[in-house]
């Protein structure tokens, strides 16, 4: 079967939810038995999001093969079974750096390097490479039509549609259809102008996804179809909903998947959305609720912890619980004290970088340990739990990480200089290495200790989880901390690096060096998050007695 391409663009305003719409359509097509993948093309000039501020860009999602990518790839993996790779996300910066590398190497034989054809050809080559082996590839272009940054991507996709044939390509455009209260009606003019902008660069959309706070009336959909030269059945109303996991059913109810299959002449069974119906049923019918305190430094933008937020919700689904997340700035713990932690059922300290707010996180871990509050530490959340235990239990009063104090006397966490990657190759880093692309990244094996809580939760001896960090537990000082009672219950493939720690004589205190949130999905959940939320609910029931 020839690969079919769906190109997704957005107009009028940004943040319309192109990624969610693309992932939802992919979920329906996957439910029809098709092999689907999704790509995200980002117009910014950074090579990848790895060094971008989480408060500007949101979280960095790490793929199985170690790519630092846009958070939309997290949405893709949560909606479909296909795992994303380095091929599924690239930026203007990555395209330009590759073209310039080829130019320096002499690949272009002295030609003048131009946006057309060299940049557009590189974009097309990467899209085609990422589509290999799939029935349908959905390609989302970041930004808004009309932005200067996205023009090379749109031109490349226009050319690609001509090359592979319009019978194998479909353009899907998301627009805003605002409701004007004073007029008492929705307005279609912004959509018409957005389509006009798209037409000016040679692209005629085949499907319009119209975002609004309500369903768009049939007469307005007919009007949009007429003036935008689109089939009326291809004008899809996408209203605001309580849960993003309602979107697949909403799109299917309007026949979007049927339209796509007919366009590509695909014969496949009806979509079976039973799993998504079960997700929505659990979400709508919780048997209880818990409040989780998330203590971090990027709390002003919840998207900085997008996958963690979603993983907590998935754990709620697994346990039939409604999970309320209370965001707590770790600096508030430093300035206001542990009073800000009162009234929560469980504490989660996620990953992060830099010294700001670290002492607040350490006090948070101490509060959770001493007050028997369920605690889940992720990446930095594990490291600060180790520092706290070393200082207050193991007698290493000057314990710290060399990330925060390069001259600390007792660096229980230190810069990792050498480790093995998933293929068994040795990676080496130093203090002088660049910030971008120099971390321990991607899926790594972890051995779980028999009899541990982690082993009980996962139900197997060996697991694979994703990493994104530079610093590791210092094995030189580890014996003294273990002697004081701390349990190391997860080790790397070569059994040299600490992956999971547990505090004994505590209802639930588990911390891991990896990022379990990247592999949690609404249909399957994740054992660590499920166990944590269950423990938090047990704690909640005690507190209300």
Swiss-Prot record:
Catalyzes the ATP-dependent amination of UTP to CTP with either L-glutamine or ammonia as the source of nitrogen. Regulates intracellular CTP levels through interactions with the four ribonucleotide triphosphates. CTPSs have evolved a hybrid strategy for distinguishing between UTP and CTP. The overlapping regions of the product feedback inhibitory and substrate sites recognize a common feature in both compounds, the triphosphate moiety. To differentiate isosteric substrate and product pyrimidine rings, an additional pocket far from the expected kinase/ligase catalytic site, specifically recognizes the cytosine and ribose portions of the product inhibitor. CTP binds at residues 14, 147-149, 187-192, 223. Mg(2+) binds at residues 72, 140. Allosterically activated by GTP, when glutamine is the substrate; GTP has no effect on the reaction when ammonia is the substrate. The allosteric effector GTP functions by stabilizing the protein conformation that binds the tetrahedral intermediate(s) formed during glutamine hydrolysis. Inhibited by the product CTP, via allosteric rather than competitive inhibition. It catalyses: UTP + L-glutamine + ATP + H2O = CTP + L-glutamate + ADP + phosphate + 2 H(+); L-glutamine + H2O = L-glutamate + NH4(+); UTP + NH4(+) + ATP = CTP + ADP + phosphate + 2 H(+). GO terms for biological process: 'de novo' CTP biosynthetic process; CTP biosynthetic process; pyrimidine nucleobase biosynthetic process. The keyword Ion transport does not apply. Its EC number is 6.3.4.2. ATP binds at residues 15-20, 72, 239-241. Homotetramer. Gene3D superfamilies: 3.40.50.880, P-loop containing nucleotide triphosphate hydrolases. GO terms for cellular component: cytosol. InterPro entries: Class_I_gatase-like, CTP_synthase, CTP_synthase_N, GATASE, GATase1_CTP_Synthase, P-loop_NTPase. L-glutamine binds at residues 352, 380-383, 403, 470. CDD domains: CTPS_N, GATase1_CTP_Synthase. Pathway: Pyrimidine metabolism; CTP biosynthesis via de novo pathway; CTP from UDP: step 2/2. This is CTP synthase. The gene is pyrG. Belongs to the CTP synthase family. Residues 1-266 are annotated as: Amidoligase domain. SUPFAM superfamilies: Class I glutamine amidotransferase-like (SSF52317), P-loop containing nucleoside triphosphate hydrolases (SSF52540). The active site is at residues 379, 515, 517. UTP binds at residues 14, 187-192, 223. Keywords: ATP-binding, Glutamine amidotransferase, Ligase, Magnesium, Metal-binding, Nucleotide-binding, Pyrimidine biosynthesis. GO terms for molecular function: ATP binding; CTP synthase activity; glutaminase activity; identical protein binding; metal ion binding. Residues 291-542 form the Glutamine amidotransferase type-1 domain.
């Amino acid at each position: 079967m020839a690969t079919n391409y769906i190109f997704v663009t957005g107009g009028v305003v940004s943040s319309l939810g192109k990624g969610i719409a693309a992932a939802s359509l992919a979920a329906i097509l996957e439910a029809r038995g098709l092999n689907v993948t999704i790509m995200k093309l980002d117009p910014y000039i950074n090579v990848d999001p790895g060094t971008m501020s989480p408060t500007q860009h949101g979280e960095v999602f790490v793929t199985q093969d170690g790519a630092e990518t846009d958070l939309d790839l997290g949405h893709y993996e949560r909606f479909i079974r296909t795992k994303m790779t380095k091929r599924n996300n690239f930026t203007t910066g990555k395209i330009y750096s590759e073209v310039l590398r080829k130019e320096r190497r002499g690949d272009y034989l002295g030609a003048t390097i131009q946006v057309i054809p060299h940049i557009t050809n590189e974009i097309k080559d990467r899209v085609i490479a990422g589509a290999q082996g799939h029935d349908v590839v959905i390609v989302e272009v970041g930004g808004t039509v009309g932005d200067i940054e996205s023009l090379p991507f749109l031109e490349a996709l226009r050319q690609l549609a001509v090359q592979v044939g319009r019978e194998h390509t479909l353009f899907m455009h998301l627009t805003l259809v605002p409701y004007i209260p004073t007029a008492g009606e929705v307005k279609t003019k912004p959509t018409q102008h957005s389509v006009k902008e798209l037409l000016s660069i040679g692209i005629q959309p085949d499907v319009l996804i119209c975002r609004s706070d309500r369903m768009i009336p049939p007469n307005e959909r007919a009007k949009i179809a007429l003036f935008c030269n689109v089939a009326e059945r291809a004008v899809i109303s996408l209203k605001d909903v309580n849960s993003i996991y309602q979107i697949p059913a909403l799109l299917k109810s309007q026949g979007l998947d049927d339209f796509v299959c007919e366009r590509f002449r695909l014969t496949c069974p009806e979509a079976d959305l039973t799993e998504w119906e079960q997700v929505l049923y659990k979400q709508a019918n919780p048997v209880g609720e818990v409040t989780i305190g998330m203590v971090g430094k990027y709390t002003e933008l919840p998207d900085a912890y997008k996958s963690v937020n979603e993983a907590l919700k998935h754990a709620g689904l697994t346990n039939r619980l409604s999970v309320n997340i209370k965001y707590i700035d770790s600096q508030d713990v430093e300035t206001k004290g542990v009073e800000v932690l009162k009234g929560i059922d469980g504490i989660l300290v996620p990953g992060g970088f830099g010294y700001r707010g670290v002492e607040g996180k350490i006090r948070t871990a101490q509060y959770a340990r001493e007050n028997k509050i369920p605690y889940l530490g992720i990446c930095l959340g594990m490291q600060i739990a180790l520092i706290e235990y070393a200082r207050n239990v193991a007698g290493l009063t000057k314990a710290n990480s060399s990330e925060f104090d390069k001259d600390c006397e007792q660096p229980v966490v230190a810069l990792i200089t050498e480790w093995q990657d998933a293929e068994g190759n040795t990676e080496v880093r130093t203090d002088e290495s660049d910030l971008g692309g120099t971390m321990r990244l991607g899926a790594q094996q972890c051995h779980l200790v028999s009899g541990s809580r982690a082993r009980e939760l996962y139900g197997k001896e060996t697991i694979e989880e994703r990493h994104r960090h530079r610093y590791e537990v210092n094995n030189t000082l580890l014996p003294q901390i273990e002697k004081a009672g701390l349990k190391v219950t997860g080790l790397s493939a070569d059994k040299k690096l600490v992956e999971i720690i547990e505090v004994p004589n505590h209802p639930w205190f588990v911390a891991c060096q990896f990022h379990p949130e990247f592999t949690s999905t609404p249909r399957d959940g994740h054992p660590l998050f499920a166990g944590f939320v269950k423990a938090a609910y047990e704690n909640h029931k005690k507190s209300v007695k």
